[in-house]
Amino acid sequence: MQNILVVEDDHDLNQAICYSLKKSGYGTYGAESAESGRTEFLRNRIDLVLLDVNLPDGEGFSFCRWIKFI
């Protein structure tokens, strides 16, 4: 199973995306901030990240750069 991390600060949208992906057969992890996204990324085997670029605690582009160096 492929695992997808959804980093989206809008709770309802985050839940809707995760629900839709789960129904399509993917494993999903939801995070509502860059910090919780980093935690989920390190804690789980993530194959794909769906990322909001405007997060309350950091810009999504910074998150992408962080992933690149992991």
Language model: regions and residue ranges:
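N-terminal/domain-start alpha-helical segments
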Residues: 1-70
